[in-house]
Design a protein with these regions (language model features):
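Solvent-exposed interaction patches of small proteins and small membrane subunits
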Residues: 1-123
């Protein structure tokens, strides 16, 4: 693997780490809530990018996000539970992108602690 590719992996990992390490579990105001949502969204996107990069670097054709997660779990002998959690995180990202109401906001905020732990486990 060349240095540029390694740097891309590092950049994605650093993004996740930088954006979620101090992420509060509960916002104090609307601005902080937006920051939490943005940090979760971009961190999950980086996780999905890492999965796609691993799939490609394993010589497997890259497909849609859920298929890539399944493929990397199978190819790297990861626990199926981890794959399911990564898929759930990707679904949460979709909720973040297409937020429709305050009920979904509560689901997202209630997931912050679990998503932080999952992303740290993944990287």
């Amino acid at each position: 693997m060349d240095e540029i590719r390694i740097k891309r992996y590092r950049d994605k990992i650093n993004h996740i780490t930088d954006y979620i390490k101090d992420l509060p579990l509960e916002p104090k105001n609307e601005l902080e809530k937006r920051g939490i949502f943005y940090s979760l969204q971009t961190s999950i996107e980086s996780m999905v990018d890492l999965v796609a990069m691993l799939v490609k670097d394993s010589g497997i054709p890259v497909k849609e996000d859920y298929a890539n997660i399944s493929e990397i779990v199978k190819n790297k002998n990861l626990k199926p539970e981890l794959g399911e959690k990564l898929k759930e995180a990707n679904s949460l990202r979709n909720l973040l992108v297409h937020r429709y109401n305050s009920f979904e906001e509560r689901i997202i905020l209630d997931s912050v602690k679990e998503i932080k732990a999952l992303l740290f486990k993944w990287i």
